[in-house]
Amino acid sequence: MNKLIRIALTFLLVMTTGVIQAEIVIYPVPQGIYYARHNDDYTVKVRQVGEKDWVDLYEYNVKVDMDTKSDATMVQFDFSGKVEVLVQKNNGEIRSAVVRPLSKGIQPEIDGNFLLFTIDKPQKLSVEFNGDRLNNLHVFANPIIKNVPDKNDPNVIYFEAGIHEPTDTAGKCFRIPSNTTVYLEGGAVLKGCLTCDSVENVKILGHGMLLEPQQGISVTYSRNVLIDGVTVVNPRHYTVSGGQSTGITIKNLKSFSYQGWSDGLDFMSCSDVMIDDVFLRNSDDCIALYTHRWNYYGDCRNIHVLNSTLWADIAHPINIGTHGNTETGDEVLEDIVFRNIDILEHDEDDRDYQGCMTINVGDHNLAQNITFEDIRVEHIQEGQLFHLRVMYNQKYNTGPGRGVKNITFRNISCTGKYINSSLIEGYDKNRKIENILFENIVLNGRRITSLEELNIDKKDFVEKIRICLLYTSD
């Protein structure tokens, strides 16, 4: 921890707790990547409100968007108190600017080629100039870590600031045993995957990063795994994959990818999964939930995704149900909740793979008891808002799905004029879609009262669709 650059400002508040310390913590950048990974598009600084001196941040280059392979920028810091963030745009003038998600309500000030905004709590933000979403600035303002593991503890794997290569050169991974805490100090850069295979009681913590691994973190045949705070930059495949595991918690994770098959968080035959406060910008599905795939078997249930930001440069922000087990034909995806989610982008030119909120079941899967609530869709470049389908996809499936039922969409808003019609389609009379509730749906500021206004293409084998104007408790 002594390698972190810590800048502290102490101030007094008239409170019974006495003195409160406000801090800004920035991380060293390893010399091996200092020049190679820098992006000169922006100069970013931060300071405590009321202070004179600014703290310079390192501007990382991150690749985004498989179609364009664009260079975007990322900065990170930890803080408490209230801080100002100053951004200088180094290439061209500022004609307009926006800080997203819009739900955060951050209104920046613009002065020439400078932009200023203030935050008083942790945030994951996109700063976009002149409508440019591909060469934008990502600002990750983390909470300060209070309980750092003891590096001398035999059950702690501690990665200090610097570049770390795995000793497993064949698999290019760091294998984590049971009952272990892995800590990535700020400024730690791992050039390999973290693998949790057939283990239990593992914690992966800290504000370090995984840089261009084959995949980010793999959790297979395991239980009770916590991932909190890390950043995964441009993995070749998944950011986090889960297979036949239970008790997975993911918090404050940040992810970028730009290649095909580089999904964000994918879970196959997993249960009891909690995802909270993540930022995923991926060039494949941001979050995908399946049952059987490869060597993983069983249902997918009790999944919660909360308070997060999803940005699908390619494919779906949310995709449920594609892969399953036609041999047994009895696997289920159920008791799934997505709540308080900002979707910043959905762009997919293939109609079969469109949908911000997609339940597309194949392989004899049944999807039921799924809720999407408080979802804000800011932009759809090409795609659909809703996609509910029972399908036999010849490319990925060995049989059709069994059905989709008991699905609730509540408090959904979307802005965008040129969006493809949403789709609801069953397969046959025994493999249908039923009992779908749309409650308080707002498109471009207008509250929806009918399927026609909702712009849904309702096809065969669909039953019991309801549209409610106002919230009513179940």
Regions found by a protein language model. Give the residues of each.
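Sec-dependent signal peptide recognition
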Residues: 2-10
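Hydrophobic h-region of N-terminal signal peptides that target proteins for export
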Residues: 11-21
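Beta-strand-enriched, solvent-exposed domains that form extended recognition/catalytic surfaces
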Residues: 23-149
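Extracellular beta-strand-rich solenoid/capping regions of secreted or surface-exposed proteins
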Residues: 117-119, 164-181, 189-205, 211-225, ...
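Short glycine/acidic-rich loop motifs that flank beta-strands on beta-rich extracellular proteins
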Residues: 167-171, 191-195, 212-217, 235-242, ...
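Right-handed parallel beta-helix
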Residues: 179-181, 186, 200-210, 223-234, ...
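C-terminal structural cap/anchor segments
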Residues: 357, 362-422
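Conserved small/polar residues in nucleotide/adenosyl-binding loops
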Residues: 471-474
